[in-house]
Amino acid sequence: MKDNPEAVSERLWALSCGPCLRVKFSAACKINGVRYSIVDQEKFMLTQNSGVMTEGSHNDQDIDFYGVLKEVIELQYNSNLQARRTVVQFRCDWFNQEGKTRGLRDDGHFKTIHISSYWYKTDPFILASQAKKIFYLQDTSFGKDW
């Protein structure tokens, strides 16, 4: 590519061609050594692996988005049969953080979030590499859904 500045890398070419038509959906995955599973799978388990957090912006402010994992989606980008390139995306339900009756409360030690209302329903996707794993516990001091 140094000899020919107009040449495009194999990776960029594969991405520009778009993903393959087949998409793989999974109930769980392991990203950077961290195990994630969809929230529907946790109904039958004692462990919790669906809590996710990612950094983003809302109304021109940087915030942390908190949610639960709904789907693990693996897209394949192949420009030839020898190379298998995949991108893993998470579809999440993001908890609404606006308003006085719902939102996020931070006491300096723990963050408490109201879990009965969602937002960004039309923008639910993040790259799996952007996710940070978090755990949710019921906060009895604020009542139901906190």
Predicted features and spans:
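Terminal interaction-prone segments of large eukaryotic proteins
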Residues: 1-146
